[in-house]
């Protein structure tokens, strides 16, 4: 296999081999929380590839397959001769058992999903300082029937006799549960034991270390040449702008394309902040009318997205040629995009890797190849929470660092149906009220996203003894850790009342406010 290369010059201390688990990225994030650099690779990475990285330890992730099936994904058998510690998690533990001569079968009547109490039989090595009876998160329908030679039991649960195992001599360990998830109360204790105590990895993956290494990488790659960055004002592109400014100074040009779908006051704030306050060269492109003209009569959300994306590319191409020439295009690619582009998802029926389409932000994905840019992507080794830490260390204000996620097409996909100037003005005013009141209540940083949605229907109302026929506004507030799943936020009734009263009294064209109480799944956070 060939996984995308990262820009950092360092090798990972810990490599996670991904067997298709939904938690593989989370394992890497948890390891990095202990200040140790980790990397996710495909399960079928060769021993030769691993040797080039010289990891101090390997973790085998969970996965949807069963190891006893004909085409079950397994790792390179030579991995067991590398003489480094290996930890198998859930399916990864079963891979370890099978490849080393043990037996795994279906856990008939003994499957475990959800929380289980871990009874510690051997409180040493991997389970040092793990509390007996602590809660661990289970998610398995198979179980170990016979341990390989040299292995011993470390812990059990009511339904799982071998919940944790070890071959101490070879430093091989396995857990049938998921220590990386928040539901496993002593999960981080186990991860630290493996990473720090067993693998002896040094805690040298810090924000300042990354910044220093990234600046050196950019300077070596770019030299004295010019770099163009499409600036959106989100935390990724803002952090990247600050990092590049520190690395190459005036060789950086940022292009801010105002497509007319940003929140109230944001274009002015961004220009004041980046261009005037921090003296980062930002070229402001006012393309509001151009984008709005393209969306006339368009109601389908996917068509709106495609039109906005296509038009962005055209504007970007025209303006880059006008402002250029540029040698490099800077992109805010993050590590989850790198992982996804490597296609490590596994088909449980065939055991084969599933090709996954790379997620592309609408404002950079699909840029014309004849622009002939070379890419510079210094954030591609980072997770989102790490980007925020870097941004904060570089001097980004909290209002950008902790900004709620905002979709690339902006308010255009928070207006259901056709987008018009009147609707945009209405939604901007309503959205500002939502954000102001939630911030005043001290709840902004406790909520993942809070915003308003304008519906393409009108409802009857009464205001000042007069009949009204106006748009309803939907209030959407959700709580989440990563946006993959979300629950609707239980805001105080007094706050909901205040938001509703302000919107119907201060926003022209609105006479009703409704609350979206749908979780994700089954709904999505955005309405379009």
From Swiss-Prot:
<dbReference type="InterPro" id="IPR017926">
    <property type="entry name" value="GATASE"/>
</dbReference>
<dbReference type="GO" id="GO:0005524">
    <property type="term" value="F:ATP binding"/>
</dbReference>
<comment type="subunit">
    <text>Homodimer.</text>
</comment>
<feature type="active site">
    <location>
        <position position="178"/>
    </location>
</feature>
<dbReference type="InterPro" id="IPR022310">
    <property type="entry name" value="NAD/GMP_synthase"/>
</dbReference>
<dbReference type="Pfam" id="PF00117">
    <property type="entry name" value="GATase"/>
</dbReference>
<feature type="active site">
    <location>
        <position position="180"/>
    </location>
</feature>
<keyword id="KW-0658">Purine biosynthesis</keyword>
<feature type="active site" description="Nucleophile">
    <location>
        <position position="90"/>
    </location>
</feature>
<keyword id="KW-0067">ATP-binding</keyword>
<comment type="pathway">
    <text>Purine metabolism; GMP biosynthesis; GMP from XMP (L-Gln route): step 1/1.</text>
</comment>
<dbReference type="GO" id="GO:0003921">
    <property type="term" value="F:GMP synthase activity"/>
</dbReference>
<dbReference type="InterPro" id="IPR001674">
    <property type="entry name" value="GMP_synth_C"/>
</dbReference>
<feature type="domain" description="GMPS ATP-PPase">
    <location>
        <begin position="205"/>
        <end position="403"/>
    </location>
</feature>
<keyword id="KW-0436">Ligase</keyword>
<dbReference type="InterPro" id="IPR022955">
    <property type="entry name" value="GMP_synthase"/>
</dbReference>
<keyword id="KW-0332">GMP biosynthesis</keyword>
<keyword id="KW-0315">Glutamine amidotransferase</keyword>
<dbReference type="InterPro" id="IPR004739">
    <property type="entry name" value="GMP_synth_GATase"/>
</dbReference>
<comment type="function">
    <text>Catalyzes the synthesis of GMP from XMP.</text>
</comment>
<feature type="domain" description="Glutamine amidotransferase type-1">
    <location>
        <begin position="13"/>
        <end position="204"/>
    </location>
</feature>
<dbReference type="InterPro" id="IPR029062">
    <property type="entry name" value="Class_I_gatase-like"/>
</dbReference>
<feature type="binding site">
    <location>
        <begin position="232"/>
        <end position="238"/>
    </location>
    <ligand>
        <name>ATP</name>
    </ligand>
</feature>
<dbReference type="InterPro" id="IPR025777">
    <property type="entry name" value="GMPS_ATP_PPase_dom"/>
</dbReference>
<keyword id="KW-0547">Nucleotide-binding</keyword>
<dbReference type="GO" id="GO:0005829">
    <property type="term" value="C:cytosol"/>
</dbReference>
<dbReference type="Pfam" id="PF02540">
    <property type="entry name" value="NAD_synthase"/>
</dbReference>
<dbReference type="InterPro" id="IPR014729">
    <property type="entry name" value="Rossmann-like_a/b/a_fold"/>
</dbReference>
<dbReference type="Pfam" id="PF00958">
    <property type="entry name" value="GMP_synt_C"/>
</dbReference>
<protein>
    <recommendedName>
        <fullName>GMP synthase [glutamine-hydrolyzing]</fullName>
        <ecNumber>6.3.5.2</ecNumber>
    </recommendedName>
</protein>
